[in-house]
C-alpha cells in the first residue's frame, strides 16, 4: 500500500 508496492508494480493497497 506504499510507494514501494507501486515501484514493484503491485496493486496499491491504499487505493484498493
UniProtKB/Swiss-Prot annotation:
GO terms for biological process: defense response. It is found in: Vacuole. Keywords: Glycosidase, Hydrolase, Plant defense, Vacuole. The keyword Hydrolase applies. Its main location: other. It catalyses: Hydrolysis of (1->3)-beta-D-glucosidic linkages in (1->3)-beta-D-glucans. GO terms for cellular component: vacuole. GO terms for molecular function: glucan endo-1,3-beta-D-glucosidase activity. Its EC number is 3.2.1.39. Belongs to the glycosyl hydrolase 17 family. Implicated in the defense of plants against pathogens. This is Glucan endo-1,3-beta-glucosidase, basic vacuolar isoform.
